[in-house]
Amino acid sequence: MMNLSRAVVRSFATTAGRRSAAVPKDQIEKGYFEIRKVQEHFQKKDGKPVFLKGSVVDNVLYRVTVALALVGIGGMGKLFYELSVPKKE
């Protein structure tokens, strides 16, 4: 069983290496270069966190997520308070 797993790992590792070395530059798909542009945009050293380097939609989505998380934490605090302090009748 151990030899089978080693053979599978070896076949995957050597195939990927051969495949990348054998492909000429003119046969690389356009999508690869588009992905490289996006990676360069997100890896720029501009002091902004990665989750804020996207578009305005990403920024709004981040702020809405933080706001909803704070509302949820506040709701849990209120629930714990109401359950721990009984109402006076």
UniProtKB/Swiss-Prot annotation:
GO biological process, one term: mitochondrial electron transport, cytochrome c to oxygen
Any GO MF annotation of the entry: oxidoreductase activity
InterPro entries (alphabetical): Cyt_c_oxidase_su7a_sf, Cytc_oxidase_su7a_met
Transit peptide location on this chain: 1-31
Entry superkingdom: Eukaryota
Residue spans crossing the bilayer: 59-81
Entry keyword set: Membrane, Mitochondrion, Mitochondrion inner membrane, Oxidoreductase, Transit peptide, Transmembrane, Transmembrane helix
Topology Mitochondrial intermembrane: residue spans: 82-89
Record topology, Mitochondrial matrix segments: 32-58
Membrane topology note: Single-pass membrane protein
Gene Ontology CC annotations of this record: mitochondrial inner membrane; mitochondrion; respiratory chain complex; respiratory chain complex IV
Subcellular location: Mitochondrion inner membrane
Family to which this protein belongs: Belongs to the cytochrome c oxidase VIIa family.
PANTHER family from the UniProt entry: CYTOCHROME C OXIDASE POLYPEPTIDE 7A, CYTOCHROME C OXIDASE SUBUNIT 7A, MITOCHONDRIAL
Complex formation: Component of the cytochrome c oxidase (complex IV, CIV), a multisubunit enzyme composed of a catalytic core of 3 subunits and several supernumerary subunits. The complex exists as a monomer or a dimer and forms supercomplexes (SCs) in the inner mitochondrial membrane with ubiquinol-cytochrome c oxidoreductase (cytochrome b-c1 complex, complex III, CIII).
Protein name: Cytochrome c oxidase subunit 7A, mitochondrial
Provenance organism: Drosophila melanogaster (Fruit fly)
Lineage of producing organism: Eukaryota, Metazoa, Ecdysozoa, Arthropoda, Hexapoda
Gene for this chain: COX7A
